[in-house]
């Protein structure tokens, strides 16, 4: 396979994966049933890419969502971490994990949490441990009803009344002393 085809397939996989993010089907750029119907007639994904506008449409949506997140106003810069709070909007729910990965790559020495506000007064969030020391995200998230992997984890249903408690725990979760005898 040539590198151009490999790139196209990677981009298609990333776009389809991105389309799965959100809290409900209404948040998605393309309904999964419609996505299936668009893909199903093609036995070769490269033919699908060449014959439809699905890939560029999803790439555009992802780019637009990231641009909206980058323009957000509410950011709390804590001692060892950065807390980003996104609004109650479909684009914010779609971009939450992707944006967490982006800010983690841009500032690998810090931990990052991206929370989206919900209409019910609760937050859903993606937490990334510092890329320079990728551990502890799972431990933090379990304290707030979430779970995940050591470097990347999430929470659901964080009550607004607990936001400051989460911010305080998040601020200290990734400092050197929190690692115990093993250190960083």
Positions of predicted regions on the chain:
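A structured phosphate/pyrophosphate-recognition subdomain
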Residues: 1-80, 87-89
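Glycine-rich, acidic loop segments that terminate in or are immediately followed by a histidine
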Residues: 82-184
């Amino acid at each position: 396979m040539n590198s151009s085809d490999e790139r196209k397939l990677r981009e298609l996989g990333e776009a389809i994966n991105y389309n799965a993010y959100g809290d409900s089907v209404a948040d998605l750029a393309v309904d999964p049933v419609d996505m299936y119907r668009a893909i199903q007639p093609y036995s070769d994904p490269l033919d699908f890419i060449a014959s439809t506008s699905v890939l560029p449409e999803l790439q555009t949506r992802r780019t637009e969502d990231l641009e909206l997140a980058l323009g957000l106003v509410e950011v709390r810069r804590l001692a060892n971490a950065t807390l980003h709070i996104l609004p109650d909007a479909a684009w914010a729910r779609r971009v939450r994990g992707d944006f967490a990965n982006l800010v983690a790559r841009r500032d690998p020495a810090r931990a990052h949490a991206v929370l989206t506000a919900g209409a019910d007064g609760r937050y859903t969030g993606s937490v990334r441990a510092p890329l320079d020391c990728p551990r502890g995200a799972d431990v933090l998230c379990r304290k707030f009803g979430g779970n995940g992997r050591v470097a990347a984890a999430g929470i659901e249903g964080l009550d607004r009344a607990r936001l400051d408690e989460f911010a305080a725990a998040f601020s200290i979760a990734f400092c050197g002393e929190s690692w115990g005898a093993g250190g960083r």
